[in-house]
Amino acid sequence: GNLGRRFCTILDEKRDHLRQRYGLDLTLIGAADSRGAAYDPKNGLNLEEVVALKSSGASIADYPDMGREAWLATDLVATAQADVLLEASPVNLDQGAEPGLSSIRTALRRGMHVVTPNKGPLVVAYSELHELAASHGVQLRFDGTVAGGLPALYIGQRTLRGAVISQLEAVPNLCTGYVIDMLADGLTWDQARERAREEGVLEGDGSWDLEGWDAAAKLVILANAVLDVPARME
């Protein structure tokens, strides 16, 4: 999707910076989408080629020589000899947060660190996934699931580690607030929703945001991560 493609672009642009500043020499050895996967454990995938394929509307399975149409993301995770999994599939709460949940479970069990902006697996299996990560000595990082542009989870979990946090106040979904502001300005519901979609604030039919699912998911993650309250969505 857009996030994975943008990640590849940034990784390509920042390669020298990451090496010089942090001593990180990252190689993308595999990638998957809804139509297949590509895997090259020896040489790694060419980031520009991956971005070009996805920008053209093609599948990663069309990657020259290394594309695999029969593979799902879970097949790639179960096979790849990788250090880190970046999991950025759709939330899919109506499907039990799959395939993201299975991919993350498999990666943790195989000793991979996991970084994900995907709320779905965390709101249905937060405790399980953290226990898996701890038992296998790896990290599960998910700062991008809540207030991706702000260090909200980082502050709550690490900066304020010595504090007792007893209450959270938040506006967890900016899209909803944006639509409400337009309604207050006199626009109809349909007009406000259409403008939000045109301006890129609202995606798809908007139900994930406007029916409160996004806000609920973020609050579940905050409750678990910051307040240590074992909340989950079903």
What residues fall within each predicted segment?
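Substrate-binding/catalytic subdomain of NAD(P)-dependent oxidoreductase enzymes
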Residues: M182-L183, Q191-E234
